[in-house]
Regions:
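Short Fe-S-cluster ligation motifs
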Residues: 47-64, 338-367
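Radical SAM enzyme [4Fe-4S]-AdoMet core and its adjacent flexible, acidic
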Residues: 129-136, 143, 147-260, 265-283
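Accessory C-terminal segments flanking Radical SAM cores
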Residues: 227-345
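Short flanking/linker segments adjacent to small metal-binding domains or redox-active Cys/His motifs
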Residues: 76-79, 319, 360-367
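Canonical Radical SAM [4Fe-4S] cluster-binding loop centered on the CxxxCxxC motif
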Residues: 5-40
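Radical SAM/AdoMet-radical enzyme domain recognition
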Residues: 44-61, 70-199
Length: 367
């Protein structure tokens, strides 16, 4: 894997900066403001992705605020320029979901992912603008999805990964009814400056316990565990080099105003004296394909690619993770050519070690 691909597999789009919640770990800088994406931005992106969607599966991920806060009429107008081959995904806090939104999801074949951190007592960081618990509203929205038979994924943020927690979380999500589950260990990024450094043994034990819980009842597609097992299988088959893509997915994030940040959505909306605003262009003035073709010319991206090569040279886990994410390098270290981050320790290194620990502990006994 070298360089940045000129063809993404999906585009992240920000229909509004506004979020009706005020989660303590959120990285977004403008979530109190309602800056809505003009339809002209959506139309420019739709024109760019049309040829890509004809040759591969292609998705638009509506994220970067609470997408439902943009309203059904405006979101429908943003969807309209895209062809039928483009999949639409929404990451939502679920608090606004009602039957009318379910009608919208079904009419537009939207794939829904909800953000919820486990049982009610695990959602203390997810609060309203008045700093009141949001769990009841989240759970109510999820109940509407289930009543309407709309499949959904779930995204769970874990603030303190430690032994005893993983089984509780997995059992909760089994009962919740999600089809896919992603586990994100809280990250120090954006406006969230809280440290995410944890004892290595605790994090490894958390992931190992999660594997055990999943193996007992693997009804849920557990994102991190399944990816780890695919990598382990590839190593055993001698195909480890084929796991990572040949080039980095550029993951273009198109902000509400059309500006484009590549590789890490978490950098959108931030500014640095050295790197500027991290953007590589704006779809209102430059076609997205042209922006992607010139990605390496963005100074911070060139520095990031140097960091990726440093990871390749020095880290035995590179074949699994492909190098620390750009935003984590920047928000933890202030630059992009560093290597190991707390995020990669928590969510890559300890993850793989936890999976391998579980495998060793449950290795069949020779007869």
């Amino acid at each position: 894997m070298k360089g940045v691909s000129a063809t993404p597999s999906y585009v992240v789009m920000q229909p509004t900066t506004l979020c009706n919640l005020d989660c303590a770990y959120c990285y977004l800088p403008f979530r109190k403001d309602d800056k809505r994406m003009p339809v002209a931005v959506s139309a420019a992106v739709a024109e760019a992705v049309a040829p890509w969607s004809r040759t591969q599966r292609f998705s638009i991920v509506w994220h970067g605020g609470e997408p439902l806060a943009a309203g059904r009429d405006h979101l429908a107008a943003l969807f309209a320029p895209f062809g039928p081959a483009v999949e639409h995904h929404i990451q939502t806090n679920a608090t606004l979901i009602d039957d009318a939104w379910c009608d919208f999801f079904q009419a537009h074949d939207v794939r829904v992912s909800v953000s919820v951190d486990g049982p009610e007592h695990r959602n203390g960081e997810r609060v309203t603008r008045g700093h009141r618990p949001a769990y009841d509203r989240i759970a109510r929205g999820i109940r509407v999805l289930r009543r309407r038979d709309i499949p959904f994924s779930a995204l769970c943020v874990v603030g303190r990964p430690e032994p005893g927690l993983a089984t509780e979380l997995y059992d909760y999500f089994l009962d919740l009814g999600c089809e896919v589950l992603g586990i994100n260990v809280e990250e120090q990024e954006g406006v969230n400056e809280r440290t995410n450094r944890h004892p290595a043994a605790d994090v490894t034990a958390f992931w190992s316990e999660l594997v055990a819980a999943w193996r007992r009842d693997p009804r849920i597609h557990l994102r991190e565990i399944e990816w780890s097992l695919r990598y382990a299988a590839a190593v055993l088959d001698g195909n480890a080099d084929a796991v990572l893509p040949r080039r980095l997915d550029p993951i273009p994030t198109v902000a509400h105003d059309g500006s484009v940040v590549l590789l890490s959505p978490e950098l959108a909306g931030f500014h640095d004296p050295r790197y500027g605003d991290f953007t590589s262009g704006n779809v209102l003035t430059t076609p997205l394909a042209q922006i992607l073709a010139g990605a390496a010319g963005t100074p911070w991206i060139a520095e990031f690619l140097e960091g990726v090569e440093a990871c390749r040279r020095t880290c035995p886990y590179f074949g699994f993770c492909g190098g620390a994410h750009a935003a984590n390098r920047y928000f933890e270290h202030g630059r992009f050519d560093v290597t190991e981050t707390d995020h990669c320790r928590n969510s890559k290194i300890r993850l793989l070690e936890g999976v391998l620990d579980h495998a060793r502990d449950h290795e069949p006994t020779a007869v």
